[in-house]
From Swiss-Prot:
Keywords: Cell cycle, Cell division, Cell shape, Cell wall biogenesis/degradation, Cytoplasm, Glycosidase, Hydrolase, Peptidoglycan synthesis. GO terms for molecular function: beta-N-acetylglucosaminidase activity. GO terms for biological process: carbohydrate metabolic process; cell division; cell wall organization; peptidoglycan biosynthetic process; peptidoglycan turnover; regulation of cell shape. This is Beta-hexosaminidase. The keyword Protein biosynthesis does not apply. Belongs to the glycosyl hydrolase 3 family. NagZ subfamily. InterPro entries: Beta_hexosaminidase_bac (IPR022956), Glyco_hydro_3_AS (IPR019800), Glyco_hydro_3_N (IPR001764), Glyco_hydro_3_N_sf (IPR036962), Glycoside_hydrolase_SF (IPR017853), NagZ_Beta-hexosaminidase (IPR050226).
Length: 361
């Protein structure tokens, strides 16, 4: 059977369960689609996951990019057979207790284990690290954040990024320009952050600026409004994405929208309008999660935006290690020692407050 050549489109979709249905195969063959995000509902065990990712990658060429939210703590989609990853705040606690060097070493090991284990199962990308500062205001961020100190966040994220690279994965910093100061959860409401741009510059924006300079591959903007900068949420804002992120900060990587089905995005209109505004604001790729009906609505008469960098940016997010090589790495004593070290950092407190961030069952 000939595998069809279909350039990757700018939409990332999802699926319902452990295997692809015929309807889902047809959806994923649509030229509008370029990637797929997996959730807990798609994971039964490691062998099933490998079968699923192989099935997805066999559909078309170039292969669909497969992503997951696999940060650690409350946001680790795959559990059985994977190393339990600590909440990122654990690395911040090491920073405070044992110093920057110890914390950076730990962050590098977490990134390496996280990426290698996912790579072994055919996953290209984890949407990590969280670059939000922990101001103590935002439960949906909370211990997903490394620290409140921008320098600590940037240095720990950079160390994690180096570990991800060893495991064959790129980084995706989120949620630009910072979700940690607001109280609301943008999955459920549209939060507002009333600080000025200068206040954001001295704190929340600093990790994004540093990580951009250090090769961060992708950014995901927040569904948060910053009224003193723009009346539109950051993910729908040309000011935030084209002027501040691209021009002022100089970010040259991929911009993924956050999920366009989140409540924080719904005020922009229907799914076609949300996608249009996202693309016009500067997003390269939009996520449409947990609503296959909206993916179908979006791809009906879909016109792929003029983005000459899209193919290159998609390919840049592809895994660079490969499943077989990652599985070989996992057999080494050095890697198994890293797994034991990382598992020792995790604790039941990491998931206090629930594991369902952004998840639908």
């Amino acid at each position: 059977m000939t595998v069809p050549h279909i350039p990757r489109g700018p939409v990332m979709a999802d699926i319902a369960a452990f295997r692809l249905t015929e309807e889902e195969k047809q959806r994923l063959l649509d030229p509008a689609v370029g990637g797929i995000i997996l959730f807990r509902r798609n994971f039964q065990n490691i062998e099933q996951l490998k079968t699923l990712t192989a099935e997805i990658k066999a559909l078309r060429t170039p292969e669909l990019i497969i992503a997951v939210d696999h940060e650690g703590g409350r946001v680790q989609r795959f559990i059985e057979g994977f190393t339990r990853l600590p909440a990122m705040s654990t690395l911040g606690e090491i920073w405070d207790k044992d110093g920057a060097s110890a914390a950076e070493t730990a962050a590098g090991q977490v990134g390496r284990v996280l990426a290698t284990e996912l790579s072994a199962c055919g996953i290209d990308l984890s949407f990590t690290p969280v670059l939000d500062l922990d101001w103590g205001n935002c439960p949906v961020i909370g211990n997903r954040s490394f620290h409140r100190n921008p320098e600590a966040v940037a240095r720990l994220a950079l160390a994690l990024q180096k570990g991800l690279t060893k495991g064959g994965m790129k980084s995706c910093g989120k949620h630009f320009p910072g979700h940690g100061f607001v109280e609301g959860d943008s999955h459920l409401v549209l939060p507002e952050d009333w600080r000025s741009l200068s206040e954001l510059e001295t704190a929340d924006l600093a990790p994004f600026r540093i990580m951009s300079r250090e090769g961060m591959a992708a950014v995901m903007p927040a569904h948060v409004v910053y009224p003193q900068v723009d009346t539109k949420p950051a993910g729908f804002s040309e000011i935030w994405l084209k002027q501040i992120l691209r021009r002022d900060i100089g970010f040259k990587g991929v911009i993924f929208s956050d999920d366009l089905t989140m409540e924080g995005a719904c005020g922009a209109g229907g799914i076609k309008e949300r996608a249009r505004i996202s693309f016009e604001a500067g997003c390269d790729i939009v996520l449409v999660c947990n609503r296959p009906d909206l993916v179908d609505e979006l791809r009906e008469d879909f016109r792929i935006p003029d983005n000459p960098t899209l193919a290159q940016r998609w390919q840049y997010m592809a895994n660079t290690l490969g499943s077989a090589a990652a599985q070989a790495v996992m057999q080494t004593a050095d890697f198994q020692a890293a797994q034991a070290f990382v598992a020792g950092l995790a604790s039941p407190q990491d998931t206090a407050g629930g594991v369902k961030v952004g998840e639908a069952f």
